[in-house]
Amino acid sequence: MGSMTTPADVHDVRDPEQPGRLLAIERDGLIPLLRARAEEDFALPVGACPGWSVRSVLAHCSAALTRVVENRFEDGVFSPESNDRDIAERDGWSNARVVDELERGMTEAGPVIAGAGGKLDGLALGEWVHAGDVRDAFGEPGAYGGAGLPDALALLARITRERGHVPLHADLDDLDEPLRLGESGGERPPGRFIGDGPTLVRLYTGRPVDGAEFELVGVEAKDLNIFG
């Protein structure tokens, strides 16, 4: 008798198109937003990334995606020092040029990530989260949510399971079925989250959750952070 596959388990099967789809969805919403902003808005501080402005975050994201497209992964790539160098290399660029590079990267990186066997999937999720950081800095609604949220949550669930992260069962306002995150071997009883998807994303990425209504039982917020 075969084992039953639950909706929560389906997320374990990698969809190679998912990271690129997430980038494309976010591109279609974020790029017009950026092109409509005043130049001075690019200097706004980004609370989730101390010391970085909106422009810094965008330059980091566009550089990372360009590296993916051009297959440039030297030793130390994506370290804080490497990220700072990538941003500094774009200091002489106009804001429009940074946005153009970001648009190209969000378009062209998807097929490369799809063919990488999963090792770059986390980068796509990180890009989507940084787009939320920018929306948050602008005071725009929908940060860490929107049309890309279902793909982002599925990616987050699979990445946390692959990493053997602390187990959590999430009952989300945004999904019909509970989402299972973290290791599933049964060594640890799972924690429980009740709330919305954007708040769950904030918890897993170390973003502030001030004012959000949610329940978290059996695990501490600091233990969920995949970037911590």
Predicted features along the sequence, with ranges:
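Structured surface interface patches that mediate subunit assembly and partner/cofactor docking
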Residues: 2-19, 44, 73-80, 114-228
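Active-site-adjacent scaffolding segments
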Residues: 2-118, 122-129
